[in-house]
């Protein structure tokens, strides 16, 4: 089986530092506001993102519309490749807003899986378009998103962003990972607020890291955290 030889990484990653010591006190209010149908999120979708979304759907349909996995914020795409190898009966769409990251050498040894595509798109638009199109991904990953650790940056984190209800509405098995425990605790809290679920934050130590960040954080001795939620069943996975 093909495997990924990650590029050399200097082990000098510092833990996230923040004045915030727990779930943000404004999170519940913000999540409720964003879920309020009388205050819809009206940011226009750009033509570029619409074309990118349509192209990714065309690739999925051309591959037979296998059960879908979304790897959102996939960076250089290593996680997308790993997910495609691990789930050969699924189709994986790796989405990132940076053309530079998507174009980098991923150091993947052996043949690349064919059950995937990469698309450059803004996630805020992509998630809303996916919801509008009625997509129901089987699995949905947010791996090590930008933590925005300053207290005043809550609204920049996905759980504090107006797009969060669209992420949840897509359903499926949703997984978020981070090396900042508070980020995952907030993500979990926001999920529970929207769904009435009892999802949990858990410590996470993978047998094989699937992103450069995951490998770097592990090698630097960071604790890793994740939330896994089966949104269709309403139960923690």
Question: Model-derived features: where do they sit?
Answer:
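Conserved beta-strand/loop positions that form the S-adenosyl-L-methionine
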Residues: 72, 95
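Conserved beta-strand signature within the Rossmann-like core of class I S-adenosyl-L-methionine
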Residues: 170-178
């Amino acid at each position: 089986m093909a495997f990924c030889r990650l590029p050399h990484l200097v082990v000098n990653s510092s833990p996230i530092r923040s004045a915030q010591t727990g779930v943000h006190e404004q999170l519940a209010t913000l999540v409720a506001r964003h879920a309020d149908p009388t205050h819809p999120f009206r940011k226009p979708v750009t033509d570029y993102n619409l074309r990118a979304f349509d192209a990714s759907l065309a690739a999925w349909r051309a591959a037979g519309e296998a059960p879908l996995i979304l790897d959102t914020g996939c960076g250089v795409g290593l996680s997308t490749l790993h997910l495609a190898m691990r789930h050969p009966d699924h189709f994986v769409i790796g989405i990132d807003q940076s053309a530079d990251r998507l174009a980098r050498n991923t150091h993947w040894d052996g043949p690349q899986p064919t059950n995937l595509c990469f698309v450059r798109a803004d996630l805020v638009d992509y998630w809303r378009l996916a919801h509008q199109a009625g997509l129901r991904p089987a699995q949905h990953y947010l791996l090590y998103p930008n933590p925005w650790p300053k207290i005043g940056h809550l609204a920049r984190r996905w759980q504090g962003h107006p797009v969060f209800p669209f992420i949840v509405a897509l359903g499926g098995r949703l997984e978020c990972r981070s090396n900042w425990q508070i980020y995952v605790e907030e993500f979990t809290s926001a999920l529970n607020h929207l769904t009435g679920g009892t999802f949990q934050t858990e410590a996470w130590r993978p047998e094989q890291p699937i992103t450069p960040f995951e490998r770097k954080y592990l090698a630097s001795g960071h604790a890793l955290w994740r939330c896994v939620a089966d949104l269709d069943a309403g139960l923690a996975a």
